[in-house]
C-alpha cells in the first residue's frame, strides 16, 4: 500500500523539482545582486510583461525583433524593426508599463540580424562576462553586471561604483569582436 501511495505521489512531486531548482537559482542570483530582492523580482516581471506587450502590439507583429532587459527599473530595448515609427512604438509601449522608470531604446532600423551574428553575440556576451573576472577592484563581483550584446555592441548594466564601472568597461572593450561598449550603469559607492 505504501509503495502504491509513493508511486502516486511521484508524478505530483516531480513538478516540484524544477520549481525548487529554479527558486534556488533565483535566490543565489539575488544574493549577489545589489538590488533589493523586490527590485530583482520586479525586473524579472518587467522583462516578462514588456516582452508580452511588444509581442501583442499589432504595429510590431511580424515587423522585426525587440529584446527586453530590465535592471533596477531601467529597461534596455535592443533589436531591429523596419521603421523609425516602429522604434518609437516599441519604446512607447514599454515606457507606459507599471514600474518602468526609464527606457533606453537601442532598437535599430533594418532586417533582423542573421543566425551567425546572433551566435557571435552569444559568444561575445560569454567572453565579456569572462573578462569581468579580470577586474581588479576590491569587492567587485562580476555577477553584479548584466551583459547584453546586440550586433557586436555590448551593453553593461548594474549598480556599481565609478571605479568598478570604469574597470569593467576597460576589460570588456578589449574583447575581440566587440564593436562598442555602452555603459548603462547606475553608480553607488560601496558601503564602508
Place the predicted regions along the sequence by residue:
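N-terminal targeting leaders
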Residues: 15-192
